[in-house]
Amino acid sequence: MDIKEVREYLPHRYPFLLIDRVLNIEPGKRIEALKNVTINEPFFNGHFPEEPIMPGVLIIEAMAQAAGILGFVTENKKPSDGYIYLLVGTDKARFKRQVVPGDTLHLFAEYVVIKRNIIKFTCEAQVDGKTVASAEMLVAEQKV
């Protein structure tokens, strides 16, 4: 899925669109997406100018966006149909390594269960095959 199609499944736009490409998606199962981290990211101006590190909360957001795409594809819906997914909870969030300019962030999400329009995902972010962050995420479908 290229960036044009990614934009069909996510309502986010610059500077908050954190998915560049989807490499693999199995509806109802899993997704693998990419975020190319460059020095031009606006958050590096303040986090930290001399030693730029991607903020952990933005890694969480990138994993949530990958999970959102998986949710939309699984449910056969798009934001243009009048739906969005909201991040309503995270559990077991862990940060193991820093993400810096030049890294390619591989984002994985697995669909666990859906109950009352809330989907649970397990998510992981990797750089060079090494885990940099992981979390369980809850997203809720909302009609807009």
Curated annotation (Swiss-Prot):
What InterPro entries does this protein's entry cite?
Answer: FabA_FabZ (IPR013114), FabZ (IPR010084), HotDog_dom_sf (IPR029069)
Q: Does the keyword Lipid metabolism apply?
A: yes
Could you tell me which CDD domains the record lists for this protein?
FabZ
Query: Which major enzyme category is it?
Result: lyase
Catalyses: a (3R)-hydroxyacyl-[ACP] = a (2E)-enoyl-[ACP] + H2O
Q: Where is it found, in Gene Ontology cellular component terms?
A: cytoplasm; membrane
Tell me, what is an example of a GO biological process annotation in this record? lipid A biosynthetic process
Write out the entry's keywords from A to Z. Cytoplasm, Lipid A biosynthesis, Lipid biosynthesis, Lipid metabolism, Lyase
Q: What subcellular compartments does it reside in?
A: Cytoplasm
Q: Where does the record locate the signal sequence feature? A: none
The enzyme's E.C. designation? 4.2.1.59
Q: Name one GO molecular function term.
A: (3R)-hydroxyacyl-[acyl-carrier-protein] dehydratase activity
**Main localization (coarse):** cytoplasm
Q: Which Pfam families match?
A: FabA
Question: Any idea which residues are catalytic in this one?
Answer: H47
SUPFAM superfamilies, per database record: Thioesterase/thiol ester dehydrase-isomerase (SSF54637)
* Family note: Belongs to the thioester dehydratase family. FabZ subfamily.
- HAMAP family referenced in this protein's UniProt entry, alphabetically: FabZ
Q: What does this protein do?
A: Involved in unsaturated fatty acids biosynthesis. Catalyzes the dehydration of short chain beta-hydroxyacyl-ACPs and long chain saturated and unsaturated beta-hydroxyacyl-ACPs.
Q: What is this protein called?
A: 3-hydroxyacyl-[acyl-carrier-protein] dehydratase FabZ
Q: Which organism is it from?
A: Alcanivorax borkumensis (strain ATCC 700651 / DSM 11573 / NCIMB 13689 / SK2)
